[in-house]
Amino acid sequence: VAFEPLSLEEIQIIFIYRKIISNDEKGKILIENGLSAIAPMLRRAPDPEGEEGYTLFHYSLREHILKSQDMANSVQTAKEAFCELAMKPDDQEELTNYLYRTGIDHFIDVKDFKAAGKALLNFYWLLNLFNLGKTPSDINSYWSQLPISKQQIDACYLFSLMGKDHVGYSDGD
């Protein structure tokens, strides 16, 4: 469910955070052995910073995993873990850049639109997004995925810009 390749260290931090492995050499070896066991399904690829990480070899495998009933619980647990981590992106130094770059994507993925909106209104988060290579177009794309309601303080402006027939419009919160 990661939105970009993750390094061994980043994967290890996620597993430590979820208390799946210990924070020592044994935990690291367990991750290395696990990656070796599924190596035919993985490929190495750079993240936006040029750091090499692991990703699934084929996009179709990712889609299969995301849609498989057998994997539904594991996928949901992983999505929740990424969202929890993204709530405080500075807490895990090795993941900070990844969490700022993709945290809003993770919030939107689990339909936590409130968290996504709060991140988009957080100037420190926006500064990090721009410093990590995101553009105003990327920010606009995030906003376009969020529902709009009459309850928002800026609703009158949004409705005049996008219209009541906008795909994100709703009468609720």
Name each model feature, range by range.
Residues 3, 8-92, 100, 107, ...:
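C-terminal leucine-rich, beta-strand-based interaction scaffolds used for sensing/assembly
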Residues 77, 114-115:
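Alpha-helical positions within canonical tetratricopeptide repeat
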Residues 103, 115-119, 155:
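Solenoid-repeat scaffolds in large eukaryotic assemblies
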